[in-house]
């Protein structure tokens, strides 16, 4: 099992934290364990409440069913069903940017 550094950033929410996240742990779960309060609703990858935007690194969000190919190509990620596959940086609180 690998552990990656995941940096979560939201200027509006005053968040700029780097957390450790195992490659078999969802990023949202790791953030909560680290004491961060990120938005979520379904926790199943079927809505956009937890949406973020990846700015560096890579993730696996193959469990998600909400984002379309264009949104994924643009870097959007559902943190509730995303595993890190490298060190990465994600802008949180990006739901409004999807629409």
Curated annotation (Swiss-Prot):
Pfam families recorded: Fer2
Keyword presence, Electron transport: yes
Cofactor entry: [2Fe-2S] cluster
Domain 2Fe-2S ferredoxin-type stretches: 4-96
Residues that bind [2Fe-2S] cluster: 42, 47, 50, 80
A biological process term (GO) from this entry: electron transport chain
Any one Gene Ontology molecular-function term assigned to this protein's record: electron transfer activity
Coiled coil (residue ranges): none
Secretion signal, residue range per the UniProt entry: none
Key words of the record: 2Fe-2S, Electron transport, Iron, Iron-sulfur, Metal-binding, Transport
InterPro entries given in the database record: 2Fe-2S_ferredoxin-like_sf (IPR036010), 2Fe-2S_ferredoxin-type (IPR001041), 2Fe2S_fd_BS (IPR006058), Beta-grasp_dom_sf (IPR012675), Fd_pln (IPR010241)
Cofactor: how bound: Binds 1 [2Fe-2S] cluster.
Keyword Transmembrane listed: no
Purpose: Ferredoxins are iron-sulfur proteins that transfer electrons in a wide variety of metabolic reactions.
Membership in a protein family: Belongs to the 2Fe2S plant-type ferredoxin family.
Protein name: Ferredoxin
Organism: Limnospira maxima
